[in-house]
């Protein structure tokens, strides 16, 4: 497979000292195989452990690593937005920093670039607890009802985005709703989606925060605000 000319990769990290070095090392191994130019943007979202220290140590040894640090925790959406806005190359890929995806499968998304503007992974066999699966099903059903676009896995953190999308679609959701906002605004703007099945792996270290009640309630509040903002917005 030919290499893409340039690729930015970012991933949020919050208290991921057990995963962050392996995540960055994996990106360092894979990106030179798929892109002529590339950058890694680890977004340290106000971690209280050694996550930021580890990121900075690795960045000192590799000029392709461009860290973003939040002094205070901004939430998942805030971290995604920081990586989204910091990216500089023609293609932008984001995933989570907890090693629950096989980064080698980025090639599956690259193969579909001619078919869409956003290449969206969906988890073929989601390896999460039942409550997270239930939350995802209910959330996805509500999103489809409100915004009308059909996507199998709205919140799958394995997405590739073309620069023209990033230049037009501005994000503001600070919480877990950021993927929904990206897709809703992109759909409204007329951009095309393509979906690709990807492998989902069990978390082996660190602690998930997405199923906390406070996170869920914030996401639902932001969802209805977004619906109110864009339902009558012209393309």
PLM feature spans:
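Cell-envelope/extracellular polymer assembly enzymes that use nucleotide-activated donors
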Residues: 6-8, 39, 181
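Acceptor/aglycone-binding surface of glycosyltransferases and processive sugar-polymer synthases
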Residues: 68-86, 91, 103-176, 202-219, ...
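Catalytic donor-sugar/metal-binding loop of nucleotide-sugar-dependent glycosyltransferases
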Residues: 171-174, 184-201
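Conserved donor nucleotide-binding strand/loop of the catalytic core
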Residues: 38-41, 52-86
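A conserved acidic beta->alpha catalytic loop
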Residues: 44-53, 99
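Acidic helix N-cap motif at the loop->helix transition within catalytic regions
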Residues: 18-22, 49-58
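Short, well-formed alpha-helical segments that are part of the catalytic scaffolds
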Residues: 16-31
């Amino acid at each position: 497979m030919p290499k893409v000319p340039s690729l930015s990769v970012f991933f949020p990290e919050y208290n991921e000292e057990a995963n962050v070095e392996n995540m960055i090392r994996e990106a360092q191994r894979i990106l030179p195989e798929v892109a002529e130019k590339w950058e890694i943007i680890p977004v340290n979202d106000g971690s209280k452990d050694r996550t930021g220290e580890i990121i900075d140590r690795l960045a000192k040894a590799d000029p392709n690593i461009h860290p973003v640090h939040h002094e205070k925790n901004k939430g998942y959406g805030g971290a995604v937005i920081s990586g989204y806005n910091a990216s500089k190359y023609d293609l932008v890929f984001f995933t989570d920093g907890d090693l629950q995806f096989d980064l080698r499968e980025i090639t599956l998304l690259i193969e579909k670039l001619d078919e869409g503007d956003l290449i969206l992974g969906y988890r073929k066999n989601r390896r999460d607890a039942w409550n997270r699966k239930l939350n995802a099903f209910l959330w996805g059903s509500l999103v489809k009802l409100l915004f009308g676009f059909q996507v199998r896995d709205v919140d799958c953190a394995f997405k590739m985005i073309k620069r023209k999308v990033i230049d037009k679609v501005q994000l503001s959701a600070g919480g877990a709703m950021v993927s929904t906002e990206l897709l809703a605004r992109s759909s409204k703007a007329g951009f095309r989606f393509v979906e690709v099945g990807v492998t989902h792996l069990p978390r082996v270290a660190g602690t998930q925060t997405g199923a906390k009640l406070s996170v869920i309630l914030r996401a639902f509040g932001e969802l209805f605000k977004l619906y109110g903002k864009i339902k009558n917005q012209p393309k």
